[in-house]
Amino acid sequence: MITREMIRNGFESGTVSIEEEYAGCIGICCRIGDNAFYFLGSEDDDLTKEEYWESYTLDMTIDMIFNILKDVESAEEHGLDETELDYYISVLAA
């Protein structure tokens, strides 16, 4: 299970970051380890990384990521399968 603390620690260690383009993502995405996923709504599709951080705090970002990765159902609702979720759990738990 992923916790907000795990995500915060990931940001602090560099394991988690917000990227504009990474691993096939076009636009803002969340990178965890070597993979990435979209986590913003379509209204923010055209933000740059700098604009993102002007609009959202780290705590807001952690909450958004947590709400996607908190369980299999939430992950699947956001287009992530169980294998991807397991990968993110293993990276954040390391």
What would you call each of these model-derived segments?
Residues N35-M60:
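Intrinsically disordered, low-complexity regulatory segments enriched in Ser/Thr/Pro
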Residues I7-G10, Y52, D71-A75:
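Long, compositionally biased, charged low-complexity segments
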Residues M64-A94:
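Low-complexity intrinsically disordered segments
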Residues T3-E21, E82, I89-S90:
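Short linear interaction motifs
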Residues T3-M6, T48, T57, T61, ...:
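Intrinsically disordered, low-complexity coil/linker segments enriched for acidic/polar
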Residues E12-E43:
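Amphipathic, interaction-prone secondary-structure segments
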